[in-house]
Amino acid sequence: SAFFANQDSSTKKALDGDEDISFFGKHQAGITTPMQKACYLVVLDLHTTDKKEVIQLFKDWTDYSSKLVDGELVKKDGSNALLPPTDTGETVGLNPYRLSLTFGVSADFLKKLGLESKRPKLFRDLPPFPKEQLQDKYTGGDIVIQACADDEQVAFHAVRNLIRKGRNKITMKWSKSGFAAIGDRKETPRNLFGFKDGTANVTTEKEFDKVVWTDSKDW
């Protein structure tokens, strides 16, 4: 309710899930971060070609994200209960549960903003896979937000409030939620086919520098 959403984020928290992951660093969190239990992924269409508006949007998202990963509300509202709250309030009383927020953009995003010349050479579509049956409504898009946490509601709350902040410039194209049975994180978790999924994933900084991070001069 609006009443609970208006409560200060210092409201007594649950006893578990108090570990947080910084939003700031050399690389974005959520890429090399140890796997969390839940993920909420959303792809957005961008409806402006104004670079200044897009820059402001990402600044606003940075402000929100830095608070969300610390388990705070995106904004502390005033005492007037008749006004709708800025934060939707689903995480009042919850800890951050290792929430990580990761943002990505597509080649179409760069094209819309006239930034195609900045596109890294290796930034291209994956080749077709045998027998794939892609549906247009689940392909493409301009911006992707990945929210991962050890509590599904925390991940959902983060994405919901980020979208609300930019709703005059973006619309949701598609979204997907998922989970992983990560156990004690000492072993690769099994997927729903019963296979251990990700055993061969790279794990060291040297390997990440080789296959994940780009040092393209154009970027």
Residue map of PLM features:
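Long, histidine/aromatic-enriched segments associated with O2/redox biology
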Residues: 2-219
